[in-house]
Amino acid sequence: MRIKLIEVRKKKKLTQEQMAQRLNISRTTYTGYENGTFSPSLEIALEIKKVLGYKKDDIFLNSNVG
């Protein structure tokens, strides 16, 4: 998930802080999702996809979402 999440966020020209604010989580938590320290809940994973406007499911391949 890490590389794809960073790639899609940067294409949308969003910072980690902006993502965290839109998801109503801390920047530390969001950064943890990107670097693989934390795994998002299914609810947060779906919200990440929504915020990024990402339609494909493969943004979360090879991760422990849920």
Identify the residue ranges that each predicted region occupies.
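Short, basic-rich loop-to-helix N-cap that marks the start of a DNA-contacting helix
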Residues: T37-E47
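Residues in the helix-turn-helix
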Residues: Q18, T29, D58
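Recognition helix of helix-turn-helix/homeodomain-like DNA-binding domains
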Residues: I25-F38
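DNA major-groove recognition helix of helix-turn-helix
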Residues: E34, I44, L52
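Short, charged recognition helix plus adjacent turn
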Residues: V8-K13, G32, E43, D58-G66
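Short basic helix-loop element that most often maps to the first helix and adjoining turn
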Residues: I3-R22
